[in-house]
From Swiss-Prot:
Stated family: Belongs to the WD repeat IPI3/WDR18 family.
Function: Functions as a component of the Five Friends of Methylated CHTOP (5FMC) complex; the 5FMC complex is recruited to ZNF148 by methylated CHTOP, leading to desumoylation of ZNF148 and subsequent transactivation of ZNF148 target genes. Component of the PELP1 complex involved in the nucleolar steps of 28S rRNA maturation and the subsequent nucleoplasmic transit of the pre-60S ribosomal subunit. May play a role during development.
Gene giving rise to this polypeptide: wdr18
PANTHER family tied to this protein: WD REPEAT-CONTAINING PROTEIN 18, WD-REPEAT PROTEIN 18
Name by which UniProt lists this protein: WD repeat-containing protein 18
Predominant cellular place of this UniProt entry's protein: nucleus
Gene3D superfamilies per record: YVTN repeat-like/Quinoprotein amine dehydrogenase
C-alpha cells in the first residue's frame, strides 16, 4: 500500500482514547494515535515536521511528542499559565503561544524565550504565521487583530516593548479564528468574530478589503489553496462558502445563503476548518463530537468520524516522510524551553551553552540612501578628477619649460653653425 500524501490530525476535549488521532482523509482509516492528556482549542501544532505539540487543556504546559514515538511524551514545556492557543512557524524556527492576554515567542533551536508581546487587553484566542514565517497574526477576546513583523519584534530596543505593525479594530466582538493565505508579506488574512462577520485584510497595505455579514456567529474560517473561496463555520453547525473572485459591489455586504453555497450536516457549532492540498475536500470539526469530510464541488458529506468529546482541533497536512516510519528519529533535538526572557533576572546565562545573536537597530547616524551614496561617489570622483587635472597641468608646465630650454640650445647650435659656415665661405 502506498504511503498517503495527506493526513488529518484531530483532537477533542475529552482525550479519553487519545490526545490526537492521525487518519487518512480518503478512507477514514486511523493510522496513528498520540496518548496523554487532551489539547486546548487551537492548541495543536506540528513543529518542523519532527514534533507534535499540544497545549494541555486548562493546564500551564505544552505536551511534546516525537512524530514517530507516539506512545511516549518527549517532554513538557512549562508555561507561565494555561495555553489558550499555539502555533509553530512554517520554517520550524519559532514557536508562539497565547497565554492570557500575552503572546510568548520562543526560539526552537535554543529554547530561549525571545519576546513577550503584551498589546492585547483580553485573552488571546488564535495565532498564526504567514507562510514565509515573517509575520505573526493574533486575535483575542478584545475584538482586536494584531499583525506583528517577526524581525522587528526580534530587533526591538530593550528600552521599550515590541509594537505591532497593524492594529485591526473593525470587529466589535471576540475574534474566533484567524487564517492567512499565501504570499508572505503580501498575503491576505481572513478573520472571523462573534459579531457575525468575516473580514478580509491585506497585509501589505493593512487595508480592509471586504466584510461579509452573516445571520449567525462565525466560529471558524479557512481558505481554499487557490484563495477563490472562503469557508466559514457558523454557530448553527452550517458551513458557508463565500466566493472571493467576484467583485464586491461594496466593501461591506451581506451573505445570501443560497442552497449550493452551504454545507449542512453538523448539529452544533463548527469549531475548526481545513481544506485539502488539492482543494477538493473540506475537513470540519464541531462541538457535536464529529469530524466531517466534505466534497467541495457537490457539498456532500463523504464520511463522518466520531470523537469522544467536542472537537478542538482539525487540520490537514502533507504527510511527513518520517511520520509513519517507527525506526526514524528527529533530525534535531528539542532543547529545554525557558520560562524567562533572555537576559532577564533569573534567566539562564551564557554558561547554559547558548549564544544569542540579536541584530539590533543602529544607534549611530542614520544610514544614507542609495541616492545619497551615489551623490557622494560622484563628488569623490569629481575631486579625484580635479586633483588629476591640476597635477597634469603642473606636468605640462614642467615639460614646456624643458622643451623651451632644449629649443634655446638648438637655436644656439644652429647660430654657431651658421656663423662658422659664413666665415669659411668669406675666406674663400
Amino acid at each position: 500500500m502506498a504511503a498517503p500524501l495527506e493526513l488529518v490530525l484531530s483532537a477533542d476535549a475529552a482525550g479519553q482514547v487519545a490526545n490526537c488521532t492521525v487518519w487518512e482523509p480518503v478512507t477514514g482509516s486511523v493510522l496513528l494515535t498520540y496518548r496523554g492528556g487532551n489539547t486546548s482549542h487551537r492548541g495543536l501544532a506540528v513543529l518542523g515536521g519532527q514534533y507534535l505539540l499540544g497545549g494541555q487543556l486548562g493546564k500551564n504546559y505544552i505536551n511534546v511528542w516525537e512524530l514517530q514515538r507516539r506512545d511516549q511524551l518527549q517532554q513538557k514545556i512549562v508555561c507561565p499559565g494555561p495555553v489558550n492557543c499555539l502555533s509553530a512557524s512554517p520554517n520550524g524556527l519559532y514557536l508562539v503561544a497565547g497565554i492570557a492576554e500575552s503572546i510568548y515567542l520562543w526560539e526552537v533551536s535554543t529554547g530561549h524565550l525571545l519576546a513577550i508581546l503584551n498589546s492585547h487587553y483580553q485573552d488571546v484566542t488564535c495565532l498564526t504565521f504567514t507562510d514565509d514565517s515573517s509575520h505573526i497574526i493574533s486575535g483575542a477576546k478584545d475584538s482586536l487583530v494584531l499583525v506583528w513583523g517577526l524581525y522587528s519584534v526580534l530587533q526591538v530596543e530593550t528600552s521599550r516593548g515590541p509594537e505591532p505593525r497593524y492594529v485591526w479594530s473593525r470587529h466589535s466582538l471576540p475574534i474566533t479564528d484567524v487564517q492567512c493565505g499565501i504570499g508572505g508579506p503580501q498575503a491576505r488574512v481572513a478573520t472571523s468574530s462573534l459579531d457575525q462577520t468575516i473580514k478580509l485584510w491585506d497585509i501589505c497595505s493593512g487595508d480592509l478589503l471586504v466584510s461579509v455579514l452573516f445571520d449567525v456567529r462565525i466560529t471558524s474560517v479557512a481558505f481554499d489553496p487557490a484563495e477563490y473561496h472562503l469557508f466559514c463555520g457558523g454557530s448553527d453547525g452550517v458551513i458557508y462558502q463565500v466566493d472571493l473572485y467576484t467583485t464586491p459591489e461594496q466593501r461591506e455586504r451581506p451573505f445570501h445563503p443560497e442552497q449550493e453555497m452551504v454545507f449542512k450536516g453538523h448539529r452544533n457549532q463548527v469549531t475548526c476548518l481545513s481544506v485539502s492540498l488539492d482543494g477538493s475536500m473540506l475537513i470540519s470539526g464541531s462541538h457535536d463530537e464529529t469530524v466531517c469530510v466534505w466534497d467541495i464541488q457537490s457539498k456532500q458529506s463523504l464520511r463522518s468520524v466520531p470523537h469522544r468529546g467536542p472537537v478542538t482541533n482539525v487540520f490537514i497536512i502533507a504527510a511527513p516522510s518520517n511520520m509513519l516510519r517507527a525506526e526514524s528519529k528527529p533530525s534535531f533535538p528539542l532543547p529545554h524551553f525557558s520560562k524567562h526572557l533572555q537576559g532577564a533576572e533569573g534567566c539562564e546565562g551564557p554558561e547554559s551553552g547558548g549564544v544569542i545573536l540579536r541584530l539590533g537597530k543602529q544607534q549611530g547616524s542614520k544610514e544614507n540612501t542609495y541616492l545619497q551614496r551615489a551623490d557622494q561617489l560622484q563628488s569623490l570622483l569629481g575631486e579625484s578628477e580635479g586633483k588629476n587635472l591640476s597635477g597634469l597641468v603642473e606636468q605640462l608646465r614642467s615639460r614646456t619649460s624643458e622643451l623651451e630650454e632644449e629649443l634655446n640650445v638648438v637655436r644656439k647650435i644652429n647660430k654657431d653653425l651658421f656663423d662658422f659656415s659664413a666665415r669659411i665661405i668669406t675666406k674663400q
